[in-house]
């Protein structure tokens, strides 16, 4: 497992994941090796654990973490909340939105990132996630050679003062690294 800086295009640290272990146990070890203060740490859903999130914030950094079904009720609550608000174009809660449209190599992709920090209900319902400040949904539509696909991805963040544009850039930077 490695820590990659999208800004510097450089690997800052690496730890070996034991055959009898997984990334969840390696992530805290890797974080201990790094000075992450004032950074935004992005991870896929494997790293979306409340203890890892707390460790990042305790190190004076922030996170943008992919959220999937491995988080059970926490995921389900956020998914229902975001999908319901997306249906209403987030008209009933404070939010920011980032919209991008890209077309290259015969592919057209539209990505809308909706971010809200109006989540006090979530913090009360899931107190173990004490560092969470916002939730986001990425709503993507892709057309390739006339075939259209649609995808939604969920994210949580400790940033309470950033816009959807910032979160969208963090997510895109993460996927740029994943696709290297």
Show the residue positions of the predicted features:
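Short hydrophobic alpha-helical runs that function as membrane-insertion/retention elements
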Residues: 62-67
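Short, surface-exposed basic-aromatic patches at helix termini and helix-loop junctions that form
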Residues: 53-61, 83
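An anionic, glycine-rich sequence signature occurring as long contiguous blocks
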Residues: 68-172
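Alpha-helical scaffold segments in soluble metabolic enzymes
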Residues: 29, 33, 55, 77, ...
